[in-house]
Swiss-Prot record:
Membrane-topology descriptor: Multi-pass membrane protein
Family of the protein in this entry: Belongs to the UPF0761 family.
Keyword terms of this UniProt record: Cell inner membrane, Cell membrane, Membrane, Transmembrane, Transmembrane helix
Main localization, broad class: membrane
Matching Pfam families: Virul_fac_BrkB (PF03631)
Protein name: UPF0761 membrane protein NMCC_0461
Subcellular location: Cell inner membrane
Length: 408
């Protein structure tokens, strides 16, 4: 077997082709640049976020111990071994932040919300979301992520760590305590990432796909942390150069790696919807989008006749495309008044006999320029005019014609 034949075999393999698709999306979304930006934002907002979380916990004394568990979890996750000095400084800054005035406290909250908003915008860009949540809904999501999310995680970590220690002592094998604690940390890291991937993007993300992406990312994070700790313990080049300040570059490198893995997990999660039906192999040209738009509208027309709305999952069962691409088409149709999103799902705004195919073609494939045009524009218009005239029919007429051709 020649090298080209082996290469073609890899391209035909579903797993290899999907992996290459994920790598391409990783590059298209410019994840390393986004991770660098998130690293800088985290440096500015980490202390305010921890301060706001602990301040909220102090309102309810019962949460004090659980908030400490979350801070400890952040220490283990964000600050690698060898950079412990950084977290000592963070704790010192957080304690000093408690002495701020009312205006200073407001600025802490604003800075914290800015970090959450940056995460939200980055995730929405990865899922290719063009429409934002309403302002009030955004605020509620941000506040929940900033307060109740960490507190819930702290509650879970406290119970899990306590159960692990009790189980290890009861079994007479305390040496297993470290492994069980790592498993507990991995579990809650997976839950935290699952919540981020499932609820932060303003896009439908299946729970199972969010879990797969979160689990893979959590394993990568735990492996990276172990390798990072091993490297810092065996190679002390930074220490010989920076001395006591070696913790700072270690911390920056780890933060950048952390965000690269988290955003890479988001890219993987958003790509998983293309696995079914090997949708990752299809091209994303204008003709394909126009065909998909017609399928969407025909499905909504059939649902309208039955008096029901269609959830996003229903479209995916009939159209071989990813949820992010599907969401883009639905949002564009909604912006131009063809459909709208209700509580039960998507609904057609008008009847199929009122939707002109040539208008859809102009919207998704080719729209003649309304302003002054040169000879090239005029020539293209002359070539496209017969096509637009052929498409001078309604969606209902097209549906009848398609069914007639299918029967013949």
């Amino acid at each position: 077997m020649t090298f080209l034949q082996r290469l073609q075999g890899l391209a035909d393999n579903k797993i290899c082709a999907f992996a290459w698709f994920v790598v391409r999306r990783f590059d298209e979304e410019r994840v390393p640049q986004a991770a660098a930006s998130m690293t800088f934002t985290t440096l500015l907002a980490l202390v305010p976020v921890l301060t706001v979380m602990v301040a909220v916990a102090s309102i309810f004394p019962v949460f004090d111990r659980w908030s400490d568990s979350f801070v400890s979890f952040v220490n283990q996750t964000i600050v690698p071994q060898g950079a412990d000095m950084v977290f000592d400084y963070i704790n010192a800054f957080r304690e000093q932040a408690n002495r701020l005035t009312a205006i200073g406290s407001v600025m802490l909250v604003v800075t914290s919300l800015m970090l959450i908003r940056t995460i939200d915008n980055t995730f929405n860009r990865i899922w290719r979301v063009n429409s934002q949540r309403p302002w009030m809904m955004q605020f509620l999501v941000y506040w929940a992520l900033l307060t109740f999310g960490p507190l819930s995680l702290g509650v879970g970590i406290s119970f899990m760590v306590g159960s692990v220690q009790d189980a290890a002592l009861a079994s007479g094998a305390p040496q297993w305590s470290g492994a069980l604690r790592t498993a507990a940390t991995l579990t809650f890291m997976t839950l935290l990432l699952w919540g981020l991937y499932r609820f932060v993007p303003n896009r439908f993300v299946p729970a199972r796909q969010a879990f797969v992406g979160a689990l893979a990312t959590a394993f990568c994070l735990e492996t990276a942390r172990s390798l990072f700790t091993w490297y810092m313990g065996n190679f002390d080049g930074y220490r010989s150069i920076y001395g006591a300040f070696a913790a700072v570059p270690f911390f920056l490198l780890w933060l950048n790696l952390l965000w690269t893995l988290v955003l890479g997990g988001a890219v993987l999660t958003s790509s998983l919807s293309y696995w079914q039906g090997e949708a990752f192999r299809r091209g994303f040209d204008s003709r394909g989008r126009f065909d998909d738009v017609l399928k969407i509208l025909l499905l909504l027309d059939a649902a309208q006749k039955e008096g029901k709305a269609l959830p996003v999952q229903e479209f995916r069962r009939h159209i071989n495309m990813g949820y992010d691409e599907l969401g883009e088409l639905l949002e564009k149709l909604a912006r131009h008044g063809y459909i709208y999103s209700g509580r039960q799902g998507w609904v057609l705004k008008t009847g199929a006999d009122s939707i002109e195919l040539n208008e859809l073609f102009k919207l998704f494939v080719y729209r003649p320029l309304p302003v002054e045009r040169d000879h090239v524009n005029q020539a293209v218009d002359a070539v496209m005019m017969p096509c637009l005239q052929t498409l001078n029919m309604t969606l209902a007429e097209f549906d009848a014609q398609a069914k007639k051709q299918q029967q013949s």
